[in-house]
């Protein structure tokens, strides 16, 4: 994570090696890249810092099978942000200006989107199976379905998020 050093009238941004920073002024991208270091004037621009490392997100999905039995599925999804500028435009990765008590919510927003997509795909697939079928040998089919659901999702594609592993 990069650091901001405040000086009179100016701010010095020192970027980290694993974060893509986007500097935006008047709706245009001024700078964009990994490991950037630069000076900026206070109140003249906005900074967004997007992590470039793969992120693992695991969660539990509970759905009913076709014979009305509850099935719990533990899902682990690894994703990365492939287009940092698109992600910064759609999600809250703001670094400056920001109040001290508020953190950027971009990764949380992406986690929620991934969870929603997986839940809807699993609900339709497991909901059509009997409990015995869901327990025995359906893991490969469900994994393939999740991979397909993530690949076909237009929101993930438009916001620069790519799924690495399911």
Segments (PLM) and residue ranges:
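Domain-core and long-helix interface of multi-subunit machines
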Residues: 1-57, 112
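Amphipathic, interface-forming alpha-helical segments with heptad-repeat character
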Residues: 14-15, 21, 53-166
């Amino acid at each position: 994570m990069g650091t901001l050093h405040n000086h009179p009238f100016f701010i010095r941004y020192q970027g980290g090696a694993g974060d893509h920073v986007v500097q935006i002024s008047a709706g245009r991208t001024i700078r964009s890249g990994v490991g950037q270091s630069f000076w900026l004037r206070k109140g003249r621009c906005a900074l967004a810092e997007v992590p470039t490392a793969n992120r693992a997100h695991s969660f539990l999905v509970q759905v009913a099978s076709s014979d009305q039995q509850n099935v719990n599925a533990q899902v682990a999804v690894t994703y990365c942000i492939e287009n940092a500028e698109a992600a910064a435009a759609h999600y809250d990765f703001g670094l400056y200006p920001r109040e001290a008590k508020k953190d950027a919510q971009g990764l949380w927003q992406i986690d929620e989107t991934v969870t929603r997509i997986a839940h809807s795909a699993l609900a339709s697939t497991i909901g059509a199976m009997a409990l015995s079928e869901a327990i025995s040998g359906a893991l490969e089919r469900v994994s393939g379905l999740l991979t397909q659901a993530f690949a076909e999702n237009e929101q993930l594609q438009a916001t620069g998020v790519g799924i690495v592993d399911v």
